[in-house]
A protein has these predicted regions:
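Internal alpha-helical transmembrane segments
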Residues: 84, 88, 92-163
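Functional transmembrane helices that form membrane-embedded active or gating regions
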Residues: 8, 12-23, 258-259, 311-340, ...
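Alpha-helical transmembrane segments of multi-pass integral membrane proteins
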Residues: 281-381
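Membrane-proximal soluble regions of multi-pass membrane proteins
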Residues: 57, 381-410
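Solvent-exposed interhelical
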Residues: 97, 135-148, 238-260
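N-terminal signal-anchor module of multipass membrane proteins
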Residues: 2-78, 85
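Long hydrophobic alpha-helical segments that form multi-pass transmembrane helix bundles
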Residues: 151-231, 235
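Specific transmembrane alpha-helix
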Residues: 72-87, 125-138, 224-247, 295-314
Length: 410
C-alpha cells in the first residue's frame, strides 16, 4: 500500500479554486461586522454613527445577499474535496479513509487553536467533527445520499418549531456557563461590545475568547449548525463523486435552470428572511428558520450556477485566476482574515472596534480580501502550497513535501 499525496497543480480544477476564493470573499464580508464589534453594539450607539443610514442599507444587503450563502458554498466545496481525496488515494492504492480521518483530526486541532487563541467565531472545528461522519455515507447510492442531505438540511426547521412551541432550548446549560464566565471575568451587558476594544493585554482578550468559545457552542446548538453542515457536505460529496465540475459544458442547460430559479426564487425569499431578521423575528424562531432554510440554500445554488456559467462564457478572463489564488490557500486566508481583523479592531492591535459604522467595516473587509489576492498570488509564484496548507498536508500524510517551487525541477 502506498502513501497518498495531495493534489498537484496540474490536477487542480480552477473553477473549484475560484469558487473557493469567491466563498472566502463572502465569508470575509459576513464575519467583519463581528470583528469590528459592530454586531455587539446596541441600537442606540449604532444610531449615533454618521453612517447610520447607509449602515442600515448595508445590513439589509448582508442579510439578503451574504448571510449564510457563502458558508453554504464553502461547505459544499468541502464535500467535493472529500470526494477528490478519496478518489485520488484510491487510484494510488492508499487508504483514503485513514488519510481523511487524520486530516480531520489535524483540522480540528487547527480550529481549536483558532477558537481559543484568535477568534471565537471559528467554523473549522465543527467542519472537522462533522467531517468525520462523511465516510459513513461512502457506499450510499446517489439517490440515498441526496435524501440524507435533504433530511439533515430540513431537521433544523423541525427542531426550531419544537423549541418555539415547548419553550425548551437545548443550549440552556451553555447559556448558564457563558454567564458564569461573564460574572467571573467582569464582562457585563454594558461593556460586552467594548471589552475586546479596551482589552490591551492578551490575557484580558483571552478571557473574552474563553467566554466566546462557550457562546460559539451555544450558537452551533441554537442554529442546529451540525445538521446543516452535514447536509451540505453530502451535497458536495454527491457533486464530487459524479465529477460534475470536470465537464461543465455538458451541464450548461441544468446550470441555467438552477441559476434562473435559484436567484428568481431565492433572492425574494432572502428579502423576507432579511425583514424577519431586522424585525426581531416577528413570526417566531421556527418560521424565521423556515425562511432561512428556503432562501439561503436556493440562493446559494443559484450563486454557484451563475458563477459556473460566467466561467464557461469568459473562461479566458484573468478574473478566474485572481479568485483562484486565495482559493488555493483557503485555510491560510481564512485564519489570516481573523488575524488581520484582530489587529485592526481589538485592543491588542489598533483598537478601532466599536468605533466605526458597518459600512466602514465592510470596506475594510473588501480591502483585506484584495490584499489576500495579491499576497496569495505572490506566495504561489514561489511556493507550491500556502503555509498552513503545507503544514496540514505534511501532518496528514506523515511526510514532508517540498514547499518551494524550485524543488519541482530538481
Amino acid at each position: 500500500m502506498t502513501t497518498g499525496a495531495p493534489v498537484e497543480d496540474k490536477q487542480r480544477h480552477i473553477i473549484l479554486d475560484a469558487l473557493r476564493g469567491f466563498a472566502l470573499l463572502g465569508i470575509c464580508l459576513a464575519n467583519y461586522p463581528e470583528f469590528s464589534l459592530y454586531s455587539f453594539l446596541e441600537n442606540y450607539p449604532k444610531e449615533l454613527f454618521p453612517t447610520a443610514g447607509i449602515d442600515k442599507i448595508t445590513q439589509w444587503f448582508l442579510y439578503i445577499f451574504i448571510d449564510g450563502k457563502f458558508y453554504t458554498i464553502f461547505s459544499i466545496l468541502f464535500g467535493i474535496g472529500f470526494s477528490i481525496i478519496l478518489e485520488n488515494n484510491r487510484k494510488r492504492g492508499a487508504n483514503g479513509k485513514v488519510i481523511f480521518y487524520r486530516r480531520m483530526i489535524f483540522l480540528f486541532l487547527i480550529g481549536l487553536a483558532h477558537l481559543i487563541l484568535i477568534w471565537s467565531g471559528d467554523i473549522l472545528m465543527l467542519y472537522a467533527l462533522v467531517g468525520m461522519l462523511l465516510p459513513l455515507f461512502l457506499n450510499c447510492k446517489d439517490r440515498t445520499l441526496l435524501i440524507w442531505a435533504s433530511t439533515f438540511l430540513a431537521i433544523p426547521v423541525l427542531i426550531d418549531y419544537i423549541c418555539q412551541f415547548t419553550g425548551v432550548y437545548l443550549s440552556s446549560k451553555l447559556v448558564e456557563w457563558q454567564w458564569l464566565l461573564c460574572d467571573r471575568f467582569g464582562i457585563t451587558e454594558e461593556n460586552f461590545a467594548y471589552w475586546l476594544r479596551d482589552a490591551h493585554t492578551y490575557s484580558d482578550m483571552g478571557k473574552f475568547l474563553l467566554m466566546g468559545a462557550v457562546e460559539r457552542m451555544q450558537e452551533f446548538v441554537d442554529g442546529n449548525r451540525y445538521f446543516k453542515v452535514l447536509g451540505l457536505f453530502l451535497i458536495g460529496f454527491w457533486i464530487g463523486r459524479n465529477r460534475f465540475f470536470t465537464d461543465l459544458e455538458s451541464s450548461g442547460g441544468i446550470l441555467r435552470k438552477i441559476a434562473v430559479y435559484g436567484l428568481s426564487i431565492g433572492l425574494p425569499l432572502s428579502a423576507i428572511y432579511a425583514w424577519s431578521a431586522m424585525d426581531s423575528k416577528p413570526f417566531g424562531f421556527g418560521t424565521h428558520s423556515l425562511f432561512y432554510f428556503i432562501s439561503v440554500y436556493i440562493t446559494s445554488f443559484g450563486y454557484i450556477a451563475c458563477f459556473c456559467l460566467l466561467y464557461l462564457k469568459y473562461r479566458k478572463a484573468k478574473f478566474w485566476q485572481l479568485m483562484a489564488y486565495p482559493g488555493r490557500m483557503a485555510l491560510t486566508n481564512y485564519i489570516g482574515q481573523s488575524c488581520i481583523g484582530v489587529f485592526i479592531f481589538y485592543g491588542v492591535g489598533l483598537g478601532m472596534g466599536a468605533d466605526t459604522g458597518l459600512i466602514y467595516g465592510e470596506l475594510i473587509a473588501i480591502t483585506v480580501f484584495v490584499f489576500q489576492i495579491g499576497f496569495s498570488s505572490g506566495w504561489l509564484q514561489y511556493f507550491r502550497f500556502g503555509p498552513l496548507e503545507w503544514i496540514w498536508r505534511c501532518l496528514t500524510y506523515l511526510k514532508v513535501f517540498p514547499l518551494m517551487r524550485f524543488h519541482e525541477k530538481s
